Amino acid sequence: MLKKDMNIADFDPQLFQAIQDETRRQEEHIELIASENYTSPRVLEAQGSQLTNKYAEGYPGKRYYGGCEHVDIAEELAISRAKELFGATYANVQPHSGSQANAAVFMALLEGGDTVLGMSLAHGGHLTHGSHVSFSGKLYNSVQYGIDETTGKIDYAEVERLAVEHKPKMIIAGFSAYSGIIDWGKFREIADKVGAYLFVDMAHVAGLIAAGIYPNPLPHAHVVTTTTHKTLAGPRGGLILSAIDDEAIYKKLNSAVFPGGQGGPLMHVIAAKAVAFKEALEPEFTAYQEQVVVNAQAMAKTFIERGYDVVSGGTDNHLFLLDLISKDITGKDADAALGLANITVNKNSVPNDPRSPFVTSGLRIGSPAITRRGFKEAQAVELTNWMCDVLDDITNEGTIERVKNQVLELCAKFPVYG
């Protein structure tokens, strides 16, 4: 018999300790991985609810199981809030991840072997935008565009040239490591010129878009996907949106999610998405996103002042790439040294990187998590100077230890969950 006082600590102390250690790590380390964030206790409450017990294959009002009247409400709330948040006429909140949302779009709009045009992973794209190691590059004919080596920005002339040459059935706009603002309208012009669908993956900037401080792709794209974590600060999951008022495409998308790619949806996660969307509709969410950009720009500026190269010379969003080629430091070594100082980043390839993706010559740095715990511009600048101190001499154990102690003091002043 199940009892409410059952707990992990008593039953599984090894797992409980791992959870406690991870909680401590999050509190005592500064998180600069651009795709990570801290979700609210309200989201955690919904995700840990009894809704995890309910199977609900299908969609609200059209389930294959009985007893779905309450989870239907949760999903309908998530759908309506997602539509309101992004100005959509269609929303599917069931994808378990951003990659599965992207896979559903491919399944709905393409046939195997169709040509797709997406951003190269080496230039800031995502695995699911046509990389040869992903389904998107294995099952479809993938053509890749990149950024201008001089400006660090998307080369729209190249995108158009490739589109005219290869006649893709779908063009993908979006990124996992690009610090500029994308001209969605220009992408749509190119797509219309060659008769292609425009598919936007806004996973990294969804929170900025929801707050109105980054251009919304919904008026331009046929289909838009996103994750629900990252800048949106919700649970880990995916979302598909559209505003083209095309019921035929909506039905194809729904069928591609279920039964095409998934079975039963995760109702506890969908409930958590509903909470996160409601949070994103609050005024303070806009203030948070504005600070995210301010902090990222302050960090990029400080790195440049300290003699480091930033791809494209700065950032217009929440992330930027630190190019370490001129410093003869690998991304792998920089990642490790900063990790010893309780600063978590991720090694990342930079444009025309001479090193392998397992070593790299750069770091991807993002500000959503530090801003979530309350950092303002002053703390962002202070932190960046500490990082430069470490990177200036990555084998100096004394410097690493000093910075680690400074990080611990700063984290104590700005707890994740105060």
From Swiss-Prot:
PROSITE patterns reported for this sequence: SHMT
Catalytic activity entry: (6R)-5,10-methylene-5,6,7,8-tetrahydrofolate + glycine + H2O = (6S)-5,6,7,8-tetrahydrofolate + L-serine
Gene3D superfamilies to which the protein is assigned, alphabetical: Aspartate Aminotransferase, domain 1, Type I PLP-dependent aspartate aminotransferase-like (Major domain)
Top EC group: transferase
Chain positions with N6-(pyridoxal phosphate)lysine modification: 230
GO biological process: glycine biosynthetic process from serine; tetrahydrofolate interconversion
GO CC terms of this entry: cytosol
InterPro entries documented for this protein: PyrdxlP-dep_Trfase, PyrdxlP-dep_Trfase_major, PyrdxlP-dep_Trfase_small, Ser_HO-MeTrfase, Ser_HO-MeTrfase-like, Ser_HO-MeTrfase_PLP_BS, SHMT-like_dom
Pfam families: SHMT
Pathway where this protein functions: One-carbon metabolism; tetrahydrofolate interconversion; Amino-acid biosynthesis; glycine biosynthesis; glycine from L-serine: step 1/1
SUPFAM superfamilies for this protein: PLP-dependent transferases
NCBIfam families found in the cross-reference section: PRK00011.1
Family per record: Belongs to the SHMT family.
Protein name: Serine hydroxymethyltransferase
Species classification: Bacteria, Pseudomonadati, Pseudomonadota, Gammaproteobacteria, Alteromonadales
Underlying gene: glyA
